[in-house]
């Protein structure tokens, strides 16, 4: 069983914001990307894609996931990019956005592969941040480890955003109380403007309303 860290006991480098979006927008994103079955996902045999680079690593049969890459310039721009526009206004200079869906694997919470999102050789000085937005409620977690070895466990609460230094080692933990654990991973540069999300009420609501109508058999239909 995971011992979640009280958000009041987190260091300043880790930022947690609950109720980050309006409920309708969160419900739409969760329905479309986790529940609807309408999104094409690439099946990755590692949550970090690191098997080829470290073939002698400890095998973890549960360490796989579905991935939908939304944004990674200059080559990847999914049509879904427009549905994440409110996030891009808050997280400046977003380098990467992808939706991860993990599958239930047994009745024990298990850690996925620990990693940093970018290699320092690619980003000298490591001046970037990672953020995770949880699409649904579940008893999984994100484990974050600072350079001093201190470990924090962030519970996967729907509509929660957690942001932290991208060079800090982190990993997800599997959920045992849902079939699918959905989260959106962002890598960005610059200072985030969290307050702007509250100012985008109409934008969030319009995306949610139009998006739900475009999906087959939306909730409540």
Residue ranges of predicted features:
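Non-heme Fe(II)/2-oxoglutarate
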Residues: 1-92, 204-207, 212-220
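Catalytic core of non-heme Fe(II) oxygenases with the double-stranded beta-helix
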Residues: 69, 74-207, 215
């Amino acid at each position: 069983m995971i011992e979640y860290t009280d958000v009041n006991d987190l260091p300043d480098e880790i930022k947690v914001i609950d109720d980050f979006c309006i409920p309708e927008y969160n419900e739409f994103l969760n329905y479309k990307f986790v529940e609807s079955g309408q999104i094409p996902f690439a099946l990755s045999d590692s949550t970090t894609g690191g098997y080829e680079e470290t073939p002698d690593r400890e095998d973890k049969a549960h360490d796989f996931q579905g991935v939908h890459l939304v944004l990674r310039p200059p080559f990847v721009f999914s049509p879904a990019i427009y549905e994440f526009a409110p996030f891009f206004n808050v997280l400046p200079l977003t380098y990467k956005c992808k939706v991860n869906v993990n599958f239930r694997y047994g009745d024990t919470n298990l850690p996925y592969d620990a990693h940093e999102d970018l290699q320092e050789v690619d980003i000298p000085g490591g001046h970037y941040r990672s953020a995770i937005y949880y699409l649904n409620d579940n008893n999984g977690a994100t484990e974050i480890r600072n350079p001093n070895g201190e470990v924090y466990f962030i519970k996967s609460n729907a509509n929660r955003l957690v942001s932290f230094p991208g060079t800090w080692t982190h990993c997800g933990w599997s959920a045992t109380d849902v079939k699918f654990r959905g989260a959106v991973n962002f890598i960005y540069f610059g200072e985030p403007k969290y307050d702007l999300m509250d100012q985008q009420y109409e934008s969030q609501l319009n995306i949610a309303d139009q998006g739900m109508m475009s999906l087959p058999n939306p909730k409540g239909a």
